[in-house]
Amino acid sequence: MAMHAKIPLNQPQNQDTAQLQPFPLVMSEPENGKRRLLKQLRIKRIPPLSIGDQQITFINTYGFIRANRTFTEFISELHRPGLQPIVTACMLPFGAGPLLDSPEKILEGLDLCEIKVRKSAAVKEEILFEVTALPKIFQGFQISAQPLIKVSSEKYVKAPGKINAGVEYKFYPTFVSLTYCPTTLKIQGRQTLATVRAKFMRSIHLEILLIFECKDDAPMAKALIKRDERDGYQASVWVHMCNITKSTQKFKTYDDSYFGQKVLAMKPVIGLVDMWGPTITVHISGKMPKTAAPYFNSRGRSCHPLSEVAPSIAKMAWSNGCRIHQVNAILQESDLSLIPGSDDILFRKVPVDPENINFKSTYWNPFRK
């Protein structure tokens, strides 16, 4: 099979595209000559695969890191201190939790959240989120069981270089993305399995081509591909979907064509949702090879947060939103020593989930700080 062979795949019958609604620009009425950005909630519903699927909710928050006030300045009843200036933008997933009957109460609970931000270091620079106060509405979510969250500094913080030692910082969530989805989506791609490489395996990767709508003079445009004469810019993100093994049976040819048919028979459908931040979803709607099954749950689904796969691209999605333009399946040797002497086999136009094709952010982009 030639390199970059184009093999058309069946597209979903329903081409109506749903999208994550952008946060509109909503400012408060002037108070003492100042206006403030109002907290906002975006709701997305992902339908279950079958009637018996249990529903849960995912909460992801976007907001700002500010230096904590030290109270060494003058304060009076008539002159109350305002918020400290924004240091940088930040994302913090609250994780999965129970169904919420009154999602509008989430915004009321944001002011009661107290989350401190500190730096640390191991092999890489790290950010620590210390949850010291959490309102009742968030108690059933993953964040309530994990009062100290440690992540790589580039993962959730827009500009970690602005956070200094000797200063206390707090995270102020402002925008909330609430996703109703089946429990079958509560699975991230298994990172340990993704690192396994062997000569008796073939790796299947997904190349997701994302389109960003931004101006030519935008700073992020320098890190993206200009789409010829068309509007917008494009980014290529690779996701490791699974490995499949080569067989040792005699009198049978196990070439690129054989493994290509395996890929086509799997019929992967790709989507883009907001769960752990912008997240790529994969659903195997066809035949699952036995050796690929450990990479998915029992319903053939897996999720790949962009903050894990490509943190820089994830941050662009905070600022400008994005949509899936095309998905290609890549067949590659698993063992690194075999890659230099082989071609990548490309299967173009993997079907995209029409219900989860877009990821849009705020019209006003506070996350560019």
Curated annotation (Swiss-Prot):
InterPro entries in the record: Matrix_C (IPR042539), Matrix_N (IPR042540), Matrix_Paramyxo_C (IPR055413), Matrix_Paramyxo_N (IPR000982)
GO terms of molecular function: structural constituent of virion
GO biological process, one term: virion assembly
UniProt keyword GTP-binding, yes or no: no
Gene3D superfamilies: Viral matrix protein, C-terminal domain, Viral matrix protein, N-terminal domain
Record has Cell inner membrane as a keyword: no
Subcellular location: Virion
Keywords assigned by UniProt, alphabetized: Viral envelope protein, Viral matrix protein, Virion
Coiled coil regions in record: none
Protein role: The M protein has a crucial role in virus assembly and interacts with the RNP complex as well as with the viral membrane.
Family per similarity comment: Belongs to the morbillivirus/respirovirus/rubulavirus M protein family.
Name of the protein in its database record: Matrix protein
Classification of source organism: Viruses, Riboviria, Orthornavirae, Negarnaviricota, Haploviricotina
